[in-house]
Amino acid sequence: MGFVKTREEVARLEKVLSRPRFVGAEMLTIDYLTTPDIVRSILPPGLEPAEEPLITAMVGRWRSNCVADFAGGAIYVAARHKNIEAAYVLAMFMDTDQAIMFGRDLFGEPKKRATSDLRHNGVSFHGYVERFGVRLIDIRAELTTDLGPATVQGAPTSTSRHCRRVTALAVKMILV
């Protein structure tokens, strides 16, 4: 396998990349409210805090047909530009070069290299993201009340679950 690809090899790569699939995802996500001043301090110029100053931290792992298995996490901030409200991706952390390149180089996602892990034992979950030896996200949760299938775009409802009760939580963000 060399750096120069045949037309057939390029066509096979284009076919795989044109239909990316991310399956078997496991994610631990926590939403929490903060103050508009904190949100304003971390948003880039041109964005304002959304009506609700919400921050989301997530740790997870995925399988895919285009970047193999990978793990990572992300921090999202509810933001507004003019009359459009959406989640602004403050940072994404991935544990493989393929996952970083696929999102960053093709779509401009703010991906960085980091280590992460997500484990569970019964209803107890622990997920973290670490970069250069610094723990950036650390979520511990006991998920005891299953509220049924989540309505997540692109996720099969038979396997996406969301829970109400989180009994322990530590979220640390380093913003440099």
Predicted regions and their residues:
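Hydrophobic, proline/glycine-rich low-complexity stretches
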Residues: 1-64
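Weak global preference for isoleucine
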Residues: 10, 30, 38, 42, ...
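Generic "edge-of-domain/loop-turn" microfeature
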Residues: 37, 64, 82-84, 134-136, ...
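A generic structural signal for short beta-strands and their flanking turns/coil linkers
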Residues: 53, 71-73, 121-123
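Hydrophobic/aromatic-rich structural module bridging two neighboring secondary-structure elements via a short loop
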Residues: 61-107
